[in-house]
Amino acid sequence: MKKKIVAIVGKPNVGKSSLFNRIIKEKKSIVDNKPGVTRDRIYSNAEWLTREFILIDTGGISVDQQLFSNEIQIQTQIAIEQADVIIFVVDFLNRLDKDDKIIAKILHKSKKPVILAINKYDKKTIDEHNYEFMNLGFSDLYFISSTHGIGIGDLLDKVISYISKNDVELKDDSTKIAIIGKPNVGKSSLVNSLVNENRMIVSEIEGTTLDAVDISFSYNKKKYIVIDTAGIRKKSKLGQTVEKYSYLRSLSAIANSDIVLLMIDATKPITDQDTNIGGLIYDEKKPVIIVVNKWDLIKNKQEQILKKEEEIRAYFKYLSYAKIIFISALDKTRVTKILDLIDEIKQSLSVKVKTYVLNEVLNKAQLINPAPEFNGNRLKIYYASQVQAYIPTFVLFCNNPNYLHFSYKRFLENQIRFSFGFDSIPINLIFRERK
């Protein structure tokens, strides 16, 4: 089932980040009374009534130190283009101003469901200007307090009703591939090579692909769907907003894919933008292949290949399980090898480990390397089993998960990974206290 995107929109200082934190139940956004303080972490996985969705705090998109109405229009437009449902936050304690009305006007022009969240409501305040909020013209109004939790459950019930409306379980055995990376690394060229058609305009101008598209194709009697998230049109008015906009598109593609191809340019050094995109893959625990494109432009290939691999491993330590492949998308060199690697990864994902064999491996691991003392005691694992999930997931029952040091978790992960052939895919370990 596709993971939907819910965007929180509103002018600065109305409580978008507080609502974001309340919904995800963590403090991932910086919250301050100074307008425009939200930075960096603008998305998270969230869940309500067992339904998962991606939550975006559009306050994080505002990168300009000076907050103008046109900047608000830009972030609102981004939310409209990316989101399945929009939560429009206004301030109950202050009268509506021109920025609120600008946002409302833009949202009315969209075809997206909009829920008006009237924040900072405390049930004690006289509702003298409620009519103002009704005059914004939205049928779904909820009086909430993100600080005190008032009305949040009802708000989320409405969100879920919208994102569940068009759910259709399609039986499709196609492997969904997300192709992500910075603009101009050759994503569209790779799509063209994979599907053997010139379906997209490919040029040296950064950001010539306007929209993410899904393309179906077959290879060796196997079906694939490739999602190309190539660079967006670079409008001067967007400025630094472009990079974060592309992250949101990549996030959606990653969340709804089976396997991710992270493309980097062989002719350029790895940058923070590359590693930040890699971080999105790590957060979603998706299988990934790092595709080094434009290898045809490199001289002394044999000498350079080891250097490039070392550089990639150094920058993407958190993706240590990722396969690396060197290609030329334009020349179609080694392009079909990517599909062979994808098939290998899918085989690894389907491996089911017998419980008794898993416990033998873990018992041996604890004998070879006992857990270090942490938080006043040592971790003791009693037994473990694999549970149903897309990536191999194991529940380990122990004396107390608080005694687990991150380095020991990594050790156990590696023991399982190499014992059962999971060296090219992510795995998930869940530690639970034995009752």
From Swiss-Prot:
Keywords noted in UniProt: GTP-binding, Nucleotide-binding, Repeat, Ribosome biogenesis
Residue ranges of domain EngA-type G in the record: 4-167, 175-350
Binding site for GTP 1: 10-17, 57-61, 119-122
GO biological process: ribosome biogenesis
Residues binding GTP 2: 181-188, 228-232, 293-296
CDD domains: EngA1, EngA2
Molecular function GO terms recorded: ATP hydrolysis activity; GTP binding; ribosome binding
Family affiliation: Belongs to the TRAFAC class TrmE-Era-EngA-EngB-Septin-like GTPase superfamily. EngA (Der) GTPase family.
Quaternary structure note: Associates with the 50S ribosomal subunit.
Designated name of the protein: GTPase Der
Gene: der
